[in-house]
């Protein structure tokens, strides 16, 4: 008995599904009315060309802005040395500091009796 009540519903649902499958949504505009700039109507090659043109225009715009900025700054650009933290660079910086300070550093230090001449003179003085 349940099958008799179920069969009209099954037949009706099959007909509805068949009709729904055969219906297709119509486009809002025809292909002739659509603009060529619409991304849905562009082919893959056209989209690549459009993207390349946009990128090229952007790069040219940024390059011209950079040139204008450099012209405005002009002589304000100052060359700076790289920072270096190796032992050689630190030694050079300390040597420069000592040479710039001049006699101030020499007065603060007690002279030592070291060097190539100091040891040689002692030996000669002892032998003589």
From Swiss-Prot:
Key words of the record: Amidation, Cleavage on pair of basic residues, Disulfide bond, Hormone, Secreted, Signal
Protein name per its UniProtKB record: Calcitonin gene-related peptide 1
This protein's encoding gene: CALCA
MF term (GO), any: protein-containing complex binding
Span of the signal peptide: 1-25
Compartment annotation: Secreted
Covalent S-S links between cysteines: 84-89
PROSITE patterns: CALCITONIN
